[in-house]
Amino acid sequence: APKISKQYRMIATPWRALSVLDRFRPTSIEVSDKWTLTQAARWARRRGIGSVLFSHERLDDMLAGWLRRQFGVEAAVGALNRRLVKQFDVIVVTSDYSSGEFSGLGAELHKVPLGVDLETFHPSMRPQGLPTPQGDGVIRLCYVGRMSHEKNPELAMRAAMELHRRGLPVQMDMYGVGPDLQAMQEESRGCPVTFHGFVESRTEVARAYADSDISMSVCPTETFGLAVLEALACGTPVVTSNRGGAYELVDASSGASGFPNPSGIADATTALINRLGPGLRASARARAEQFTWQESAHTMLQIHAGLAERIARRPYWKDNLVDARSAHREK
């Protein structure tokens, strides 16, 4: 799996993975890669095994963001998705937004929201009695995630800079590393923006959320938004864009949303600032409690069990091959 950038690896020899599957002999398979491992669906079909594609990204919006253009992307992604629907028995998505690219293709779609660790990410990570905002009146904002344009960290930063320009007392704390970090550091000079780098401990990540008054998770092409749930679980309300999977997680009781531009996010943040307090933090936690890993895992196991029951598993093809060779030698 060679690196194709500082952030990502790609499986270059997928047939080696299929060889491992032959030894493992699964009753169903689940694939999370739309590029290099889709041939696993053909492998499964030849053996009478059910196949699930877990779609973690919306390719049309993601590629349009990378290429900085929409023209030609929808047609290419549409062709790929039609092929995926034919290859896999089931497509799993995490949100209504992420299901959109499979609309009208005849896919067997299942929406399975992800979950959050409600014990690690907990309001108790915030010092007891700490007001929101704190005594100095500064509104503490945070962004937790990769400093890479597909996550739109620069939008969160620019919204904080816009709030500062409007005269609001804010402090933006950015946690994470990535290819856009240096450019963002240079752009935010002179503004109340602090970059803390990579945070290794999940406990420290939870503390970063809990110590903040508002978490900014504003990517409009996020198919779900684990960072949203982690912040909410810590009792921290969230500002997000008014489209995308993260938008589906943040309701009126737990945060706010705005147009995905610095002014729109700043407006949403300003409206949320006026609602800060213990009640909002309690509502944020209650919203996160609706999403558990136990429920996600249970739903996925049901999908796999259903596939195993309804797809008549053919005899294992290598066993047949061995039997045929033995019969030939006996002759």
Walk through the language-model features, giving the residues of each:
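Conserved donor-binding/catalytic core segment of Leloir-type glycosyltransferases
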Residues: P131-M161, D173
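Nucleotide-activated donor-binding/catalytic signature segment of Leloir-type glycosyltransferases, i.e.
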Residues: Q182-V199, T203
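Short alpha-helical donor nucleotide-sugar binding micro-motif in glycosyltransferases
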Residues: L21, V85, F198, R207-S212
